[in-house]
Amino acid sequence: FIIRPFFRKNEAWLTTFSHELTHAIASILMLNKMHSMKVYEQEGSTQYLGRSNIFITLAPYCFPIFTYFILLLMLLSSVRSLCIFQLLIGLTLGFHILCFTQQTHPNQTDIKQNGKMISYSFIFMWWLFNASIILYAVKYGIYRAVIYQFQGMWTNLLAPF
């Protein structure tokens, strides 16, 4: 109730900021050098030096950076009570879903860049991956969630052999 008036007044800017920040973080994770990031109420841009790829282009639609930031804090924290982290994970994931529903549409430049079918398939795959990590992390912690996810993924991939 305290932050709602601030959020409603600045919602367009905050969702655009989140979108561009996710592009920036994804490009840094891909070892590119950030050049600039501009954010306005209804549009923004992120420029970096290096190669682009589908992850950088579509990260804002499938990579909830604020939720992962909270998961990282949860990993580094000595606080044993998960309630505050669970609340923050819910709030940040809700914000990401709000951004996703507002920004994901067939005419979005990022989605058209790689083709709609490839883009939506990529987004769906990453949503499943992130949902499994986040849901498991809420109960068992991020470290166990990542280990479980990757062990399970490799086991399932190698099972036919």
Residue ranges and their predicted role:
Residues 2-17, 53-54:
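Short pre-active-site segment immediately N-terminal to the catalytic Zn-binding motif
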Residues 1-6, 27-32, 132:
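A generic, lipid-embedded transmembrane alpha helix
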Residues 1-5, 21, 43, 81:
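Generic preference for well-ordered secondary structure
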Residues 24-41:
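Short, charged cytosolic
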Residues 7-8, 19, 48, 84:
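Generic hydrophobic alpha-helical membrane-segment signal
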Residues 12-28:
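Active-site recognition of the HExxH zinc-binding catalytic motif
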Residues 40-161:
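Metalloprotease/metallohydrolase-associated module, dominated by Zn2+-dependent proteases
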